[in-house]
Amino acid sequence: MNKFKNIAVYGGGSFGTSLASLAAQNCNNVTLFLRDEAIAKEILHNKTNVKYLGDIKLPAHLQATTNLDIIKDFELIIIALPSYAFDDSIKLLKTHSISKDNTLLIATKGFARNPTALFSDRLKTLLPYNPTAFFVGPNLAKELAKNLPASASIASLDIDIANKIAYNLSSKIFTTNVSSDIVTLQVAGALKNIFAIKSGIDLARKQGENARATLIVAALKEIAILSKALGGMQKNSDILLEGVVGDLVLTCYSLGSRNTKFGYELGISSDKQKFLQEYKELVEGREALKLVLDLIKKYNLHMPIISEVASCVIPYVMPAFAGMT
């Protein structure tokens, strides 16, 4: 199978940088594209991204730049940006003349917005001709950057594209599997962050490990409910992919997850309204929650865990949505 001659990673946060490090294990021409000139220079000269990954050393041949004009020259472009920036970032790529020859791997988790949609649906409008796949897995950024064992699922409607990407990213310590169910992988990647908030709240309430295991089972059922409503879950076995059950378990069980940490800190807070108003760190589950409620309402779905998390989070910051729970 052919290898990509070069790989771009668009997004210089913790996950984007760790994915660039992962890609560089198998490819000698990997460039990280980011907005912060100082971080780009740090990666080039020191091979670190201290702001996001501490003192973890990055591969010596990893390049970094803020110049998006050259991203069109890369065969594989990995998108690893926050969900709120997805639409604007894809539109920006279009202005930099990426062509149908550029393969896209979407590692962003969440939903497109205005209106709420899967990223795959938004790409049908913005970049309909590009080969596209989705990357979801139980991957803590710092562990990926340290080259510790991990796995992921690669999903694409074109299974040959999924296989090619998997071949380019796989190694003895990073294993992949492929799927054509792009809907379930996207839904799982978005919802797992919401369930992690619930896990953190339960941890703060000292609910115990039995409750957390029960949460995992109930969460998988809700992933299946929304996935089926959006056209996914053609095979029940899709729920067993690393990008579904593996990512869910990791995110819900690790305080290294920003979402679990957020839920825990919310749970122990004595003034929850003040906590929610003053919490500045990006929490993808909090962002996704505002959007998934649109889908629950649109398709008239019963998803009690999502509703419970909304009742804990949204009334304080978005009172108009409280009645939807």
Swiss-Prot record:
Main location: cytoplasm
SUPFAM superfamilies: 6-phosphogluconate dehydrogenase C-terminal domain-like (SSF48179), NAD(P)-binding Rossmann-fold domains (SSF51735)
Protein task: Catalyzes the reduction of the glycolytic intermediate dihydroxyacetone phosphate (DHAP) to sn-glycerol 3-phosphate (G3P), the key precursor for phospholipid synthesis.
NCBIfam families the record matches: PRK00094.2-5
Reactions performed catalytically: sn-glycerol 3-phosphate + NAD(+) = dihydroxyacetone phosphate + NADH + H(+); sn-glycerol 3-phosphate + NADP(+) = dihydroxyacetone phosphate + NADPH + H(+)
UniProtKB keywords: Cytoplasm, Lipid biosynthesis, Lipid metabolism, NAD, NADP, Nucleotide-binding, Oxidoreductase, Phospholipid biosynthesis, Phospholipid metabolism
Enzyme class, broadest EC rank: oxidoreductase
Compartments (UniProt record): Cytoplasm
Protein name: Glycerol-3-phosphate dehydrogenase [NAD(P)+]
GO BP terms, alphabetized: carbohydrate metabolic process; glycerol-3-phosphate biosynthetic process; glycerol-3-phosphate catabolic process; glycerophospholipid metabolic process; phospholipid biosynthetic process
Binding site for sn-glycerol 3-phosphate: K109, G137, K192, D247, S257, R258, N259
Disulfide bonds: none
Keyword NAD: yes
GO molecular function, one term: glycerol-3-phosphate dehydrogenase [NAD(P)+] activity
Pathway in which the depicted protein is active: Membrane lipid metabolism; glycerophospholipid metabolism
